[in-house]
Amino acid sequence: MKVIVPMAGRGSRLRPHTLTIPKPLVPVGGKPIVHRLVADIARLCEEPIEQIAFVVGEFGAEVEKELLAVAESLGAKGSIHYQLEALGTAHAVMCASEVLDGPVVVAFADTLFKADFKISAEDQGILWVKQIEDPSAFGVVKLNEQGQIIDFVEKPQTFVSDLAMIGIYYFKDGARLRKELQYLLDHEIVKGGEYQLPDALRRLTEDGLTFKPGTVEE
């Protein structure tokens, strides 16, 4: 199993802390957010974590050294990849394209969670979601009668679903995701000037991949 952690965003919602410390390195309970995130994934995931790929901005050598140490502390190889322009979530994941091979978890670094993180051999894809009261500020998923995810809607203005994506995804075949991300880039499929991960997810479902929702307690 490999883990990709996109974390190049500015973290403006956590200012003033993020004026001096990148958002994922802001400490929560004595540990940086990103350390807690990947440690929780490693603890809950039954399959060993081989590699953790951090997608960063211009954070500097000391931050990169700290991130590699986080990976090493979990028994995984660490790697650094760069997203130097804010071109969206799909672009961020694609910045670590060489890691998209075999089973992959994508976990955006501003997410802290308590979740059911069980992955079975039959699972093609899992998106962890949380039921919320006001979904208009989030990306949400629609389910069919079998409980499978069939659509992704970003910040719905009319009610579509109350299941918000929390920013953690599992793909059994990372190469399949890489193909769809490359399609977005090649055809310049953008929204608001950014390449969005849900557009790649939608293409995967249209191609027959089955996503199921993972549950989050908090």
Language-model segments: which ranges?
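Conserved N-terminal catalytic core of the sugar/cofactor nucleotidyltransferase
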Residues: 2-5, 13, 19, 26-27, ...
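Conserved donor-nucleotide/metal-binding helix-loop-beta segment in metal-dependent transferases, i.e.
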Residues: 114-137
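Short N-terminal binding/cap micro-motifs at the start of the first secondary-structure element
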Residues: 11-16, 136
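Catalytic-core segments of class I nucleotidyltransferases/pyrophosphorylases
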Residues: 148-218
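Short, well-ordered beta-strand micro-motif
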Residues: 27, 142, 170-172
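A structural signal for short hydrophobic beta-strand segments in well-ordered beta-sheet cores
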Residues: 25, 141-143, 213
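The conserved acidic donor/metal-binding loop of glycosyltransferases
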Residues: 109-112
